[in-house]
Amino acid sequence: MTDKTSLSYKDAGVDIDAGNALVGRIKGVVKKTRRPEVMGGLGGFGALCALPQKYREPVLVSGTDGVGTKLRLSMDLKRHDTIGIDLVAMCVNDLVVQGAEPLFFLDYYATGKLDVDTASAVISGIAEGCLQSGCSLVGGETAEMPGMYHGEDYDVAGFCVGVVEKSEIIDGSKVSDGDVLIALGSSGPHSNGYSLVRKILEVSGCDPQTTELDGKPLADHLLAPTRIYVKSVLELIEKVDVHAIAHLTGGGFWENIPRVLPDNTQAVIDESSWQWPEVFNWLQTAGNVERHEMYRTFNCGVGMIIALPAPEVDKALALLNANGENAWKIGIIKASDSEQRVVIE
């Protein structure tokens, strides 16, 4: 007989019981996201999902993303309830710009030591994002990995699949001289530029929880969840001839708008058509950030830009604003052989 202590997985830092407790905690909110096409429930080796029958030539569209270092700010401020919405938004907004309806979503949650309350708050936020975008949360991976993450740190990633009719894919090929650009207002910095945000907070010595901006803590502005545009944009696509949609994420105006422009076209943005939300003015002032850098790093109050024919503008604005969006005409498309694909004037 040996006197050696018998070791368990829990002794090594992996608590299977905590993982099971998390599954029990989130089952209810996950169930609310279920679409009729989804087969089976949580716990299978894989999730099954049929294609909606309304599509004649369905094309699957997929995307994966994270939330960048906004997660670091969320962890530092111990506010975990909306970061899951950000995660879903970053994925589904990328799908809908191609005309795709999100079908299902999977998440990856990794941590050194699983805190059931924190993980439950994050995944509840993911479920809320799925509800807002009409897609099902069909599964995920919760990885407890001792020694891989410091303290209570965690990381999240998301993966989404959507579907679009082949003949209705939006790829920017129809964009032409004279098209009008419509902006959809953002809820804040969304999930991009947060390494610069955190550097500005560090250099300025500002406490985002005690610094007020427009009558509420700066932290509320910085952690406002990314706006999910899916339902508004899908209705717009059904009723209006949309030529292109750009999701303003990393790279801001300069990098994202050209992704949907054909050769020999240029987007001309009218800077006087909107005022930056105060959080962007604060960031620019506190960090002494140049204007060009602001437009390269942040959305500056614009979450999406939609290109469509001029005769469709009034109808589009009415539809979008009726659905709760802050939408306005922000610019036009011009024929141009310039290497500068976007002009802000």
From Swiss-Prot:
Q: What class of enzyme is it?
A: ligase
Name the domain of life.
Bacteria
InterPro entries cross-referenced by the UniProt entry: PurM-like_C_dom (IPR010918), PurM-like_C_sf (IPR036676), PurM-like_N (IPR016188), PurM-like_N_sf (IPR036921), PurM_cligase (IPR004733)
For this record, an example GO cellular component is: cytosol
Q: Which UniProt keywords apply?
A: ATP-binding, Cytoplasm, Ligase, Nucleotide-binding, Purine biosynthesis
Q: What's the catalysed reaction?
A: 2-formamido-N(1)-(5-O-phospho-beta-D-ribosyl)acetamidine + ATP = 5-amino-1-(5-phospho-beta-D-ribosyl)imidazole + ADP + phosphate + H(+)
Pfam families reported in the protein's UniProt record:
AIRS, AIRS_C
List the subcellular locations: Cytoplasm
Q: Which GO terms describe its molecular function?
A: ATP binding; phosphoribosylamine-glycine ligase activity; phosphoribosylformylglycinamidine cyclo-ligase activity
Copy the pathway line from the protein's UniProt record.
Purine metabolism; IMP biosynthesis via de novo pathway; 5-amino-1-(5-phospho-D-ribosyl)imidazole from N(2)-formyl-N(1)-(5-phospho-D-ribosyl)glycinamide: step 2/2
Q: Is ATP-binding found in the keyword set?
A: yes
**Matching NCBIfam families, A to Z?**
purM
* Name of the protein in question: Phosphoribosylformylglycinamidine cyclo-ligase
Name the gene.
purM
